[in-house]
Every structure is written in C-alpha cells, then in structure tokens.
Amino acid sequence: MSHILRAAVLAAMLLPLPSMADQAGKSPNAVRYHGGDEIILQGFHWNVVREAPNDWYNILRQQAATIAADGFSAIWMPVPWRDFSSWSDGSKSGGGEGYFWHDFNKNGRYGSDAQLRQAASALGGAGVKVLYDVVPNHMNRGYPDKEINLPAGQGFWRNDCADPGNYPNDCDDGDRFIGGDADLNTGHPQVYGMFRDEFTNLRSQYGAGGFRFDFVRGYAPERVNSWMTDSADNSFCVGELWKGPSEYPNWDWRNTASWQQIIKDWSDRAKCPVFDFALKERMQNGSIADWKHGLNGNPDPRWREVAVTFVDNHDTGYSPGQNGGQHHWALQDGLIRQAYAYILTSPGTPVVYWSHMYDWGYGDFIRQLIQVRRAAGVRADSAISFHSGYSGLVATVSGSQQTLVVALNSDLGNPGQVASGSFSEAVNASNGQVRVWRSGTGSGGGEPGALVSVSFRCDNGATQMGDSVYAVGNVSQLGNWSPAAALRLTDTSGYPTWKGSIALPAGQNEEWKCLIRNEANATQVRQWQGGANNSLTPSEGATTVGRL
C-alpha cells in the first residue's frame, strides 16, 4: 500500500462517517438522487438522427470537455438500442430515434457500438456521468432479423391477455402505448430478467451512471425500483410520468389529486427522482407566480429533492431540422430565459435541453446561471421561500454557501426588501425581467466574514469512472475535513486538472487539500493530496492550487 493510500485510509477512519443513505448516493428517504447536486444536460434532440446521421456519438465525444467545462455533471444520452423504424403520415415522417427499438444491438442511427463506447469513455473521463434513456414498455416486435425473439401467446406481450382498454390487464400493469400491441409484459420473469441484464451490461460495458426511464405510466413503479436494486442500485435514475389527473379514471384517487401528488407517489414507489411535470404544467398554463406550485417548490424537502426540473425536451419542445421536431408542449420563447433562471437557481435537479444550450443562443446565459448555482451551493433539497406582494415571482433560495434572491417579471426593487444582509447582483437579463442577487459579495464583499468567490484548482487529478476530484478543508464551506461534505470540482476542460469556484468567508486564514473519492459512496476515498495543507486567505477572484 502506498504512503498516500495509507494516509487516505487513516484519514477516512478518523473522520466521521456519513449516513448509510449518503454512502449509497441516496436521499435520506432512499431515493437515488446521487447527492442532489447534479446538473444534467439532455444530450440530444428529436432530429439528431436526421441532422447528424450515424455521427452523433462522435459529436458527443468531441464535445465532452466542453460539456464538463460548461458545468454539467451528467448527460442524458439517447436510447442506445437499435431502432430502424420509420413512419409517415403524408405531411410528416420520422423514426429511428430509439423509442421503437427492436434489439439491444448498439449499432444504430446515432453511431456504432465502438463510437458509443468512445463517447461514454470521453464523457466519463471528463467527469460527466452518463445516463442512458431506456424504454422497457414497448419495442418494435415486427422488425425482421431482430436479435430478441419473444413469441406471441406465452405471456411476453400485453395482448397475450384480454385487454380491457387503457388499463392494466393480466399481462401488463400499466397503460398501453398507442394500441398496446407493442407493449411488453415487464412483469414476466423472462422479460424482467432481459432488461435487468441489459441495464447491468450498460453499467459495466458502456459506462452507465444511471438511467432515464421512458413512459413509466406503462409499468409498475416498483419494477423500476427492482431493476435498479438488481443492476445499478447506487446509480442515478429518473422517471418520465407524463400523465395528468384528468387522464386517470374516476375511481382512481389520482383523478382528483394534484400533479405534485401523482408524481411524488410514483417516486416514493420507484425510489427514483421524477420529472417535474407539476412545474411544467404551471409553466404552460399558469402565470410566472404559479411556478411556485411545482414539485421543486414544495415546502417539504422530501418532495423537492425528488424533482427533476426542465424547461423543454425532445418531446415537448422544438428541435432543429425536419418539422421543428415534436413540440408537443413547447414553452413560449418569451419565457425561456425566465424558466432557466428559475430551475437553475431553485431546488430540484435541473435538466438543460441540448438545443437551448448549443443551438439557439441561450448558452452564455445558461452558463452564467450554472456558475451562480454552483457557487451558491444550491441542491435538490435546498430551502426555498416565496414572497407575495410583488408582481411576477420572487423567491429566496438558501444554498449551502450563499443565499439567492430571484425576481422574475417582478417589480421587486432590491433584495433587501425580502432578505437581510449584503447582496450583489449576479444576473440581470431580458431588460430586467430576470434578476438574481447573491449574498456576501456586494460592495464591501471583501470585508472579513463576507463570502467571496475563490477559484480552486487541483492538478494531476487522474480518476477512474465514477470518481471525481473534491476540495476539502477546515471551514464549513469546505466540509470541515469530511470527505462526505467535500466540494466537487466540475470544470475538467483541462483534465487531469480540475477547477471550480467556491464561496468562502473573506479575510480568514483557511487550509484545504485535494482528494479523489467515489461520487456515490463518500467512504471510498481513493487519494488524499500528500504533504502540507494548502493555505489561503480568501479574497474576491483569488486562485488557490493543490496537486495530487
């Protein structure tokens, strides 16, 4: 054992251990949210297979360092399974996006198996967790020469049993997809095991750090929990439950429930976060003030921590190219900046749509918001309070390092009207319709005790898949020497150098070190920086460097 590793083991033994939930990368309620500090990029749009046929994995590989430098800790990848389907209704056509796959072969319209592995390796090496979109509910059972053979009449398919309509039957415990003839019986032991083994394969061979479960209205949430337990228990997961109260039958309790209650119930049973369609519905149908009614704005942190917030995605929003993509529920252009300002400064796990980030000119604005979120230490379960008496939406968000005051389409004059202390303006966009202030960095922000932004750098941080470089030190903002509370550095554009900005009290002598640990299990400390501690006296814009 090297002296560095020996020191790391000894240090870990002497430090307080995190809870078991923390060790597993789960919330206190055992939900797989990976610590609640993820910022996810949706790594595709609907027309990718037509705009960049057979080349998308190469593009993701080439963009890996940029994605990491932009502040994303995870990427939602397209469905990796082969889909050569096609459809046309006269005015529109499509197919091949992965949502009507026919087998688990990875040589599809996004690129080859080898290109997928290279992209996953590049992203993982840059510190970006790979989350695969998976579609267990249905498949293209009629495609010739597929590598999966599930004969009819043996209980593998929904329509092997009598179908009462769009309700569960003896061969399917969820809603049917379109007519239901393509729906798999995920409760059948062979079908269940087929997916369990494939999820394990994606984790072990293709760098999966988690999964996005498509169309979860089609199968029991408990099945998602079982798959995760059996194949990737410490990984991230999120479910797409796009089903409003009115879509449930009159005898179902969800028919008179709220969107929040419906999606939270799914999360409780699946033990996975869930897309915040409660917030999306308010973005589409309510005023900006109504955005507080999303799952991420719930007064209970156990509700906020499971919310995966988004503005638009490949289904709801527009895409470059043919027919503008799906755009089933697209947010109006005039609210896109306000929506990103909200999800990137508030609780929940935010997802940024690829086209908003890299195609349509919102990238610089989104980068600025990501930096504000990271510096403030806003997490999925951060506290949020809303303030009435003003137009638009006004909220105060308490991060681990700074407090943010957010005003959207509001007549709020200054943050002092709703929060005490010193604040400085962090964001002012859309002619004042988007304003964000942060605590501790106003004029005089260099005075002792005020929070200032310090750039941290750790050199020589070579890591394995699933590990990252962290800064840990002798103040609460640096975790009080606890690896479980250390601050992850997210800029890996110069890998193996890792960088990040951390807000620290000005004028106080502080000490810190670099360390490498597993992202999901804080007890798995791989390496502590050797030698003496790094020392600094924080001031606004200062830089401090450590070396592993």
Swiss-Prot record:
Provide the residue span(s) of the region labelled Disordered. 529-548
For binding Ca(2+) 1, which residues are annotated in this chain's numbering? D22, Q23, H34, D37, E38
Principal subcellular localization: secreted
Q: Where in the cell is it found?
A: Secreted
Looking up CDD domains in the UniProt record yields: AmyAc_arch_bac_plant_AmyA (cd11314), CBM20_alpha_MTH (cd05810)
SMART domains the UniProt entry points to? Aamy, CBM_2
Q: How is the cofactor bound?
A: Binds 2 calcium ions per subunit.
Q: Does the keyword Calcium apply?
A: yes
Q: Which GO terms describe its biological process?
A: starch catabolic process
What GO annotations for molecular function exist for this entry?
Answer: alpha-amylase activity; glucan 1,4-alpha-maltotetraohydrolase activity; metal ion binding; starch binding
User: Could you give one GO CC term from the UniProt record?
Assistant: extracellular region
Show the disulfide pairing.
C161-C171, C237-C272
**Where along the chain is substrate bound?**
Y99, F100, H138, F177, I178, G179, G180, D181, R212, R217, G218, H314, Q326
**Which class of enzymes does this protein belong to?**
hydrolase
Q: Per the record, where are the segments of Polar residues compositional bias?
A: 529-542
- Look up the record and name the cofactor or cofactors this protein needs: Ca(2+)
Q: What is the effect of changing E240Q?
A: Abolishes enzyme activity
Provide the site residues for: Transition state stabilizer. D315
> What catalytic activity does the UniProt entry give for this protein?
Hydrolysis of (1->4)-alpha-D-glucosidic linkages in amylaceous polysaccharides, to remove successive maltotetraose residues from the non-reducing chain ends
Show which residues constitute the signal peptide. 1-21
* Record's miscellaneous remark: There are several isoenzyme forms of this protein.
- Complexes and interactors: Monomer.
For this entry, the protein name equals Glucan 1,4-alpha-maltotetraohydrolase
**Species name:** Stutzerimonas stutzeri
